């Protein structure tokens, strides 16, 4: 595990010791060299738990998320270059340091084998993200967004800490493998139900569940490009990862405790998709679409079947790449038009034809067009929820329809139509930007050829 953590940590001295004209080149190339390391963890006999030490281990659920995390750092660095072009070298280095610290804490969170260590690292990821949003965001509202993000996450996580201390007092251990393999036989009592709620609430806020999602659109809209990318692609997946780990430990309870949350996430999925159709702000639309996709993942995890777990894992990876790509595209528009309002940036296909192709590809991936892995994940979840209760097909089917509507609405509003009068001249798309979009789409297309490496705990 250290072969991943140590090189990533060593990016910090690399950043601070680089000359000012070499900062971007050094960090991008070295983080790209580090990114294939998790591919080595895929090569495991019979999908077992691969333990490196007492503290860290990886398994078929962790490894795809590690791959996503490491792949995203060079992309975030590439995307941030224009945003930081007027900053002094010291601030550039500070910004990159925040991204690297966030990367290290995410890697350690995904691989932690001890629940208290997982909790501490889970909370650690909050600090660099908060600094990135509140220091480098564009509008003054970023402070409000930062406080929403901080307090929602903290209030959601405190009950988890109390539940962990309680579990440690009663069982004497918080080792994830030990707790998963030993049968708990939790009875249906008030105290156990409250403990289940305390365990799940932190992750439901992080996912976010509909009703606890108000911090997400604010944080996404006000964050700089790298903040939006890492929030959408990896930080939301922390919630899904935690839920998958802990619902297995609390297994008999989840059966009946899940009902209200299943109903809420299925309903929230429709509501947030419908909200997307009314958005004028491009980043806000993509943020609400993230809430809608994550509601599908919550549904899958709470159904508790091997198929639904597979679907949740695939959907998390697919959504991570797709939403990050959409935020990059929205940012490239914002850098040229200085506005996130879709009506003010219409007709851009005439000026940036190659960018229009990336927009089309991203919109189609977002609406889960075959043969993307987004479709694979959605099909797994749809089939699992249909076999759990036939009536869910009306809600999930409606959601698929609305997703297609708002994805195409987003594409048509930004790319088609007549150009607005205030756009007289516009910079052409840079090679860096095209490369960035390609590096998002490339893994999506490659995973289409071999999706079984990201199917997680296959039955």
UniProtKB/Swiss-Prot annotation:
Transmembrane regions listed in the UniProt entry: 22-42, 60-80, 98-118, 145-165, 196-216, 224-244, 257-277, 284-303, 307-329, 350-370, 393-413, 435-455
Q: What class of enzyme is it?
A: translocase
Chief location of this protein within or outside the cell: mitochondrion
Question: Its Gene Ontology molecular function terms?
Answer: NADH dehydrogenase (ubiquinone) activity; ubiquinone binding
Q: Where in the cell is it found?
A: Mitochondrion inner membrane
**Bilayer topology annotation:** Multi-pass membrane protein
**Its catalytic activity?**
a ubiquinone + NADH + 5 H(+)(in) = a ubiquinol + NAD(+) + 4 H(+)(out)
GO CC annotation: mitochondrial inner membrane
Domain of life assignment = Eukaryota
Give GO terms for biological process.
electron transport coupled proton transport; mitochondrial electron transport, NADH to ubiquinone; mitochondrial respiratory chain complex I assembly
Q: Which Pfam families match?
A: Oxidored_q5_N, Proton_antipo_M
List the disulfide bonds in this chain. none
Tell me which UniProt keywords the record has, alphabetically. Answer: Electron transport, Membrane, Mitochondrion, Mitochondrion inner membrane, NAD, Respiratory chain, Translocase, Transmembrane, Transmembrane helix, Transport, Ubiquinone
Task: Write down the EC number.
Answer: 7.1.1.2
Family indicated by similarity: Belongs to the complex I subunit 4 family.
Task performed by this protein: Core subunit of the mitochondrial membrane respiratory chain NADH dehydrogenase (Complex I) which catalyzes electron transfer from NADH through the respiratory chain, using ubiquinone as an electron acceptor. Essential for the catalytic activity and assembly of complex I.
Quaternary structure and interacting proteins, as annotated: Core subunit of respiratory chain NADH dehydrogenase (Complex I) which is composed of 45 different subunits.
Quote the protein name from its UniProt record. Answer: NADH-ubiquinone oxidoreductase chain 4
Source organism of the structure? Hylobates lar
């Amino acid at each position: 595990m250290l072969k991943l953590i140590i090189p990533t940590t060593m990016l910090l001295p690399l950043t601070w010791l680089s000359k000012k004209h070499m900062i971007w080149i050094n960090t991008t190339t070295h983080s790209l060299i580090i990114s294939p390391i998790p591919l080595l963890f895929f090569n495991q006999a019979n999908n077992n738990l691969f333990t490196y030490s007492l503290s860290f281990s990886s398994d078929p659920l962790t490894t795809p998320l590690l791959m996503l995390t490491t792949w995203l750092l060079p992309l975030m660095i590439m995307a941030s270059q224009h945003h930081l072009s007027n900053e002094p070298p010291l601030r550039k280095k500070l910004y990159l340091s925040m991204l690297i610290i966030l990367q290290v804490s995410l890697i350690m969170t995904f691989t932690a084998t001890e629940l208290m260590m997982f909790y501490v690292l889970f909370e650690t990821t909050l600090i660099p993200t908060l600094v990135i949003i509140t220091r480098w965001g564009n509008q003054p509202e970023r402070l409000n967004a930062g406080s929403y993000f901080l307090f929602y996450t903290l209030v959601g996580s405190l009950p988890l800490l109390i539940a962990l201390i309680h579990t440690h007092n009663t069982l004497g251990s918080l080792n994830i493998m030990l707790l998963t393999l030993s049968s708990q036989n939790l009875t249906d009592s008030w105290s156990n139900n409250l403990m289940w709620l305390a365990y799940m609430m932190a992750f439901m806020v992080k996912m976010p569940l509909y009703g606890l999602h108000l911090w997400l659109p604010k944080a996404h809209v006000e964050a700089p490009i790298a903040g939006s990318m890492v929030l959408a692609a990896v930080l939301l997946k922390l919630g899904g990862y935690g839920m998958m780990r802990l619902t297995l430990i609390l297994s008999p309870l989840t059966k009946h405790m899940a009902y209200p949350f299943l109903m809420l996430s299925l309903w929230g999925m429709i509501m947030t998709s419908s909200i997307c159709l009314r958005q004028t702000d491009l980043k806000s639309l993509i943020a609400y679409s993230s809430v809608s996709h994550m509601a599908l993942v919550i549904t899958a995890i709470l159904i508790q079947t091997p198929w639904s777990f597979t679907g949740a894992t695939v959907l998390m990876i697919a959504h991570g790449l797709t939403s990050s790509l959409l935020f990059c595209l929205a940012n490239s528009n914002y850098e040229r038009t200085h506005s996130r309002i879709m009506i003010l940036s219409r007709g851009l296909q005439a000026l940036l034809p190659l960018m229009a192709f990336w927009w089309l590809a991203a919109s189609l991936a977002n609406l889960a067009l075959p043969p993307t892995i987004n479709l694979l994940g959605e099909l797994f979840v749809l089939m699992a929820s249909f076999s759990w209760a036939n009536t869910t097909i009306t809600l999930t089917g409606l959601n698929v329809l609305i997703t297609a509507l708002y994805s195409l609405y987003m594409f048509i509003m930004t790319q088609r139509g007549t150009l607005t009068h205030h756009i007289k001249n516009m910079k052409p798309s840079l090679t860096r930007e095209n490369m960035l979009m390609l590096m998002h789409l490339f893994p999506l297309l490659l995973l289409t050829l071999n999706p079984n490496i990201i199917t997680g705990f296959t039955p």
